[in-house]
């Protein structure tokens, strides 16, 4: 059996690949949780900031000899990713990450390792008035500066088989403030404590699936939507008397495992 291609550490890539797609397949049929009214994504616009790395033993001459006959230009990587987002028939960033990773392997036979990190570029609905009534626009969207979902994936080629070696989903840069109900007591500097104070938190939350294929969204009832995770976290933050950040994180982790057994 060949050694793990990632262990060779011969890889390079490109970041800030901005890709946008309109009218992707909607995400529907996800499982309901009590803390969230989220039922799916229309995916009228799907945007992502993507970082890609590719590697393999075949790239060694480019590193040690400057011989570039097998090197894939980073601008070509960008075009490849943007084109395949247009071809993608699924509804999630995780599914696209798998799809484009496999496409790299199928197109370039000398690649042994692909890493894709795809961060959502979120857009929110705006309202418009037509026929005298106020409603959500299905043509105009506003870029959000709030939290964003992320898909991280590594795939390797071993003995002519493609293996998904790592996969995780995330919500990044979630910022919340609770104006009361947070008490930090029994610490060393007691005179500096306040039994009821506002608490502003920044959170990055990551999760993995028991079955990696559930991450792609092809079976929606087994897919964990980042929007549901946000709603779950805000509900826990509201209902928990926060005695420490550690306790809050513990409660969030436990409830995520209960609500999403997959």
Q: How would you label these PLM feature ranges?
A:
Residues 1-262:
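N-terminal intrinsically disordered, cationic/polar leader segments
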């Amino acid at each position: 059996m060949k050694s793990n291609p990632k262990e060779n550490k011969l890889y390079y890539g490109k970041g800030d690949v901005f890709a946008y797609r309109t009218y992707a397949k909607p995400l529907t049929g996800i499982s309901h949780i009590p803390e969230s009214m989220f039922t799916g994504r229309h995916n009228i616009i799907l945007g992502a900031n993507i970082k890609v790395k590719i590697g393999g033993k075949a790239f060694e001459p480019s590193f040690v000899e400057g011989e570039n006959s097998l090197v894939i230009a980073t601008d070509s990587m960008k075009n490849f990713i943007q084109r395949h987002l247009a071809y993608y028939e699924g509804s999630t960033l995780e599914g696209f990450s798998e799809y484009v990773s496999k496409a790299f392997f199928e197109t370039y036979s000398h690649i042994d390792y692909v890493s894709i990190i795809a961060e959502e570029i979120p857009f929110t609905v705006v309202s418009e008035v037509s026929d005298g009534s106020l409603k959500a626009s299905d043509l105009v969207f506003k870029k959000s500066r709030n939290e964003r979902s992320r898909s991280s994936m590594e795939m390797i080629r071993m003995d002519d088989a493609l293996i998904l070696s790592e996969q995780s989903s995330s919500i990044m840069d979630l910022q919340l403030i609770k104006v009361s109900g947070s008490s930090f007591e029994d610490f060393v500097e007691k005179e500096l404590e306040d039994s009821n104070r506002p608490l502003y938190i920044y959170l990055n939350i990551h999760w993995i699936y028991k079955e990696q294929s559930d991450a792609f969204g092809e079976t929606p009832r087994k897919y964990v939507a980042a929007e549901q995770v946000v709603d779950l976290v805000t509900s826990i933050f509201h209902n928990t008397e926060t005695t420490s950040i550690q306790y809050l994180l513990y409660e969030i982790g436990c409830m995520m495992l209960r609500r999403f057994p997959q």
